[in-house]
């Protein structure tokens, strides 16, 4: 099995994990509903890339056989908190003004257990450090008090139903365990949905092993295209 990481681009929705491509919990204000979630997510990605820069990465998995192709197995999104109005619904917010927010790592179920959440978070941290960002924050789901019989996989991304009216149990939120393993510390306390922070230029996590040239390669240094304003650039 081979795993390849790449920054999101604007030349096809195959670049995003399937559930990530249609989930807009973080990208819309609390209580807002989307008539076309896939389109809204695409426009969000285009807008953020045009105004701020790279805002996501995808992990592609293949079996290594020639001609077998690869699949978008996991995707992560990150940006300044103003681009994630859905974060206002989180009880341990708001996100600090000097930090960017990782909204979630969406992992396709067959690929859970490959530590894609960890490696994608490390990729975001590397990119944030490269851009001189002070800190990265994320909201976590604390499953320590989960009722017996309930089950949320590590990379749970709310496939059951998009939450309404303050019900966050179906929200796409990272596991608190993953964030703690990645060196994040609680900055906003809450029994169920604490907010975590990682100040940058600290010790690398167990999964971090990116050289500068390798990171530049996965960032796809070619010029970005956009359809904002009805024109390609």
Name these PLM-found stretches.
Residues 27-66:
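Active-site rim helix/loop that mediates acceptor-substrate recognition in acyltransferases
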Residues 107, 112-129, 137:
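Conserved acetyl-CoA-binding loop-helix of GNAT-fold acetyltransferases
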Residues 58-60, 77, 195-199:
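Short, well-ordered beta-strand micro-motif
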Residues 1-30:
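Conserved N-terminal entry element of GNAT/NAT acetyltransferase domains
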Residues 171-232:
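C-terminal "cap" of GNAT-fold acetyltransferases
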Residues 130-134, 141-189:
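Conserved active-site alpha-helix within GNAT-family acetyltransferase domains
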Residues 102, 136-138:
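Conserved hydrophobic beta-strand within the GNAT/NAT acetyltransferase core sheet
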Residues 46-51, 65-105, 147-153, 159, ...:
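Conserved acyl-donor/pantetheine-binding loop and adjacent beta-alpha core of acyl/acetyltransferases
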């Amino acid at each position: 099995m081979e795993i390849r990481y790449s920054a999101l681009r604007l030349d096809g929705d195959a670049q995003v994990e399937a559930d990530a491509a249609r989930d807009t919990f973080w990208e819309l204000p609390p209580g807002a509903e989307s008539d076309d979630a896939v389109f809204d997510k695409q426009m969000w990605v285009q807008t953020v890339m045009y105004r701020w820069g790279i805002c996501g990465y995808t992990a592609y998995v293949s079996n290594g056989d020639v001609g077998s192709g690869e699949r978008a197995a996991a995707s992560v999104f990150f940006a300044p908190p103003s681009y994630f109005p859905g974060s206002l619904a989180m009880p341990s917010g708001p996100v600090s003004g000097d930090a960017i927010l990782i909204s979630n790592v969406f992992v396709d179920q067959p690929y859970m257990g490959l530590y894609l959440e960890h490696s994608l978070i490390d990729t975001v941290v590397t990119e944030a450090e490269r851009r001189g960002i002070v800190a990265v924050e994320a909201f976590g789901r604390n499953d320590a008090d989960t009722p017996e019989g309930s089950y949320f996989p590590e990379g749970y991304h709310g496939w059951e139903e998009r939450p309404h009216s303050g019900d966050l149990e179906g929200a796409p939120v990272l596991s608190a365990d993953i964030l703690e393993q990645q060196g994040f510390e609680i900055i906003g306390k809450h029994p169920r949905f604490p907010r975590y922070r990682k100040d940058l230029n600290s010790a690398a996590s167990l999964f971090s092993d990116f050289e500068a040239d390798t990171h530049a390669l996965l960032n796809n240094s070619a010029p970005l295209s956009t359809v904002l304003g009805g024109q390609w650039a």
